[in-house]
Amino acid sequence: MDVVRLEPMTVIGVVVDGPFDQLGTLVSQGWKRLWDEADSIQDRLGDRFVEVSEHLGDGHYREILGARVTASARTPDGMERIELPAASYVYSVHTGPLEGIAVRFGEMQEHSRSLGHEPDGVLLDEGYTPDGGQLHDLYVRLR
């Protein structure tokens, strides 16, 4: 695991909002919708899709399932756009089943604390593909 700096990025996609215990179902439905509408996202930066997760407090999360795009990309109807500022992140690569990603994020958060950094609640997972690719770049944003 390394600490890296990412430049500002724009993500356009489908938003899922809910309590942690419902995220599995909600996120699965969100990905289905995104795959159905992915071609409407223009000016994508790469072929892999991302999930940006933000812990809003009290066990409530907001997820955007989408694609990194150019800053000038148009937001399709029914989708949302978020702007992530430049920031430092703990970075790791995950290969293998998707079910292992949550565990890896937990390890990354603990690692960041061991380095004296506090995570700010934003997680970035880049690596989703319609055919279920197994390589994911994981990022835990630091305060």
Regions from the PLM with identified roles:
Residues 1-143:
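A solvent-exposed interaction/effector surface
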